[in-house]
Regions:
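Second-shell loop/turn segments in exported
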Residues: 8-12, 106-110, 117-120, 155-163, ...
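Gly/Pro-rich hinge or "lid" segments in bacterial periplasmic/extracellular proteins
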Residues: 1-45
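Append "and occasionally in soluble cytosolic enzymes with long acidic Gly/Pro-rich linkers
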Residues: 37, 113-215, 299, 349-350
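Ligand-site clamp/hinge motif
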Residues: 38-85, 223
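Periplasmic-binding protein-like
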Residues: 95-107, 270-278
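Detector for C-terminal structural segments
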Residues: 125-156, 205-214, 238-351
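Ligand/substrate-recognition segments at binding pockets and active sites
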Residues: 29-31, 180-252
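A ligand-binding cleft/hinge motif common to bilobed small-molecule-binding domains
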Residues: 78-89, 252-257
Length: 351
């Protein structure tokens, strides 16, 4: 049923398709609130401890304020500003773990069309400085990630980011592509080497990261401007790819060989890519050996970062849950999901 597949869950709970311990009892898309209740058709041996779960979608500034005001029992976040704001609040605690995601600088290659500019930016960015800005307020340390596909602790992980880096390496890329220096910045055919970075909201850490990038790229002769948008514009701007470049974040899956198709095909990047890379990605799904799949995935990522240059990882980071202290069995959990363990939500309850 094509219509059911495409539209069946649009503003409809569709309880007959929920097989887990909870089902939808109220769905309010206009207020971005969904309420779950125990599923009377749940087949598991253990019954849920909670009588209901209310989920609310909100921006990070609103989430921070709502938790401080006692409107939320739990709030997940990764940013330093929220950590500082909610830390030490009476009757609450912060539970921390490894975030299974990657923060990255992400180009829209249909707008920043010159590969030389994208490659030069990759070389010019000092990723360690971005990680320092991101984590210094929370005391988090980690190895520098070199992949969009895997966490550094996962089997098969490799650092696939090009090794030639720094302002001189970036300048060499531009000059070999025919750019010449004019004042502070490089130019070619009357056009300045540069682009805008779209940021959202007023988060001080995000703005500090932009300033570091701006300084680093200026040293390499690349001009960067800040296209600062209201936080409420995030979905529309990112969804329509109305940006040159942005600071983004993606989840990392448990099997890295599943992920190249979501980052590195021409189709996923609006036609920008490489035929050789697409053939290698197709080969992954036709390969039986898991080890060979992982080798191919790393080969794909290395080639894409060198030949296409759209995604530049710079941090994995922590995962935090600010919770009321009496809430049990809830918090960061690495790759555990309700899809892999139905008891994940069954065991959440109040002490």
């Amino acid at each position: 049923d094509k219509k059911l597949f495409n539209d069946g869950f649009v503003d409809k709970p569709m309880d007959q398709y929920w097989a887990g311990p909870f089902k939808v009892s109220n769905w309010n898309s206009s207020e971005k609130v969904i309420t779950l209740a125990p599923n009377d058709k749940w087949w598991g041996e253990k019954k849920p401890l909670l009588e209901k779960i209310i989920w609310r979608q909100m921006g990070i500034d609103s989430l921070r304020a709502a938790f401080k005001n006692g409107e939320l029992d739990a709030a997940g976040f990764t940013d330093a500003a929220t950590y500082s704001a909610v830390k030490g609040q009476n009757g609450t605690e912060i539970r921390s773990g490894q975030n299974t995601g990657v923060q990255n600088l992400q180009f829209n290659a249909t707008r920043v069309t010159d590969l030389a500019v994208r490659r030069a930016a990759f070389a010019a960015v000092d990723r360690s400085q971005l990680a320092d800005v991101t984590f210094k307020q929370v005391g988090w340390e980690e190895p520098m990630p070199g992949s969009m596909l895997a966490m550094p602790f996962q089997k098969g992980y490799e650092d696939n980011v090009p090794k030639d880096s720094g302002a001189d390496a970036a300048k060499k890329i531009l000059e070999e592509a025919g750019y010449t220096k004019s004042g502070d910045f490089y130019q070619k055919d009357g056009k300045t080497a540069g682009f805008s970075i779209t940021t959202f909201g007023s988060d001080t850490v995000t703005q500090a990261k932009f300033q570091r990038i701006e300084q680093q790229l200026k040293q390499a002769g690349i001009k960067v401007t800040n296209d600062n948008q209201p936080e409420s514009n995030f979905n529309s701007v990112v969804g329509t790819k109305s940006y040159d470049c942005t600071l983004s974040g993606w989840a990392v899956g448990a099997n890295m060989a599943d992920s190249p198709q979501y980052f590195y095909t021409k189709d996923i990047n609006n036609g920008v890519g490489d035929d050789e890379i697409d053939k290698l990605i197709a080969k992954i799904s036709a390969t039986e050996s898991k080890d060979e799949q992982i080798k191919l995935a790393n080969q794909v990522e290395k080639l894409h970062m060198e030949k296409v240059a759209i995604y530049l990882p710079f941090a994995n980071g922590p995962s935090y849950s600010a919770v009321k202290s009496k809430l049990a069995n809830y918090g960061p959990r690495l790759f555990q999901t309700s899809y892999t363990d139905a008891n994940l939500w069954v065991n959440v309850g109040w002490q």
